[in-house]
Regions:
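A SIS-like phosphosugar-recognition module
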Residues: 1-102
Length: 102
């Protein structure tokens, strides 16, 4: 039961931390959305368990914007997308969780 209680306390602590972080996150998201609203395409880069978040991001661009987007792992991005032309029209989002060993 001690482990279960530790998990419960951890969930409460995570909720409080998120509540403190969200206002600044919202501001950052709105700022980047304003700057990137005219981008022609978006790359979502993720490796390891962050690859799923990259996939989700590219799917949301399809659904919400109807613009070109792709998900790719960092190794492939460095070999392929790194050499794209007109990079000022491609928004690149790198998903890099600090706990990801990849």
């Amino acid at each position: 039961m001690d482990e279960a209680m530790d998990m419960r306390f951890d969930m409460v602590a995570q909720g409080k931390a998120l509540g403190e972080l969200l206002p600044d996150m919202c501001r950052q998201v709105y700022d980047i959305a304003e700057k990137w609203k005219n981008m022609e395409a978006y790359d979502f880069v993720g490796t390891g368990f962050d690859y799923a978040a990259a996939w989700f991001g590219h799917a949301k661009v399809f659904e919400a914007l109807g613009k070109y987007a792709m998900h790719i792992n960092s190794e492939e991005w460095l070999h392929m997308n790194f050499f794209m032309r007109n990079v000022d029209k491609i928004g690149t989002i790198i998903v890099a969780n600090t706990t990801n060993p990849a």
